[in-house]
A protein has these predicted regions:
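Well-ordered alpha/beta subsegment
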Residues: 13, 108, 112-150
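Short, cysteine/histidine-rich loop/knuckle motifs that typically chelate Zn2+
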Residues: 44-47, 58-64
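Short functional micro-motifs and their immediate structural scaffolds
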Residues: 53, 66-68
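Short, conserved beta-turn/loop elements at beta-strand boundaries and strand-helix junctions
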Residues: 81-86, 134-138
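A broadly conserved sequence feature marking short terminus-proximal activation segments
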Residues: 7, 11-40, 150
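Short, basic/aromatic beta-hairpin or loop at an interaction surface
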Residues: 95-111
């Protein structure tokens, strides 16, 4: 914010979400709308039964456009991960270190996401996780995962 703006305006600007945001299109709109309701939906092909993520118009297995959105269990395991200790990009450096992971949902699809709610050194491949949601702006909610409670 410019030096001449009010202290209140400067503080409001500092609280704005600074990370890149996803581009929401027709194929992904249902996914992001569900996230705003704190629900994790994934696509399933009605023709062949293939679950898929990322959202898209055609099934990668059979090329059918006959798709439905299905509520996921929100549970899965850490497929692989990395711990980021250094990132100078705005919005990221304040959260260091953070865990970026592929989570394999019980439905069989993998999402690139963050693991939260535990120390980075506690994350392990195969670790059971469950979904949680981060309302980063009034218009955007990100799905994240935390260690599963038995």
């Amino acid at each position: 914010a410019p030096r001449w703006c009010s202290e209140e305006t400067r503080m409001a600007d500092e609280k704005k979400y600074k990370k890149p945001v996803p581009r929401i299109d027709e194929e992904s709109k249902g996914f992001w709308e569900a996230c705003q309701r704190h629900e994790l939906y994934v696509q399933k092909c009605r023709a062949c039964g293939t679950w898929r993520y990322y959202p898209r118009a055609l099934c990668p297995a059979c090329l059918s456009a006959d798709t439905e959105w299905v509520l996921s269990s929100g549970r899965g395991t850490v497929y692989t991960y990395t711990v980021t200790y250094q990132n100078l990009a705005p919005g990221f450096r304040d959260e260091l270190p953070y865990v970026l992971a592929y989570v394999e949902l019980n439905e069989g699809v993998r999402l690139l996401t963050n693991i939260v709610g535990c120390a980075p050194q506690d994350v392990k491949i195969g670790m059971p996780v469950e979904g949680t949601f981060d309302d980063v702006t009034p218009e955007l909610t990100l799905p994240k995962f935390k260690p599963a409670v038995s």
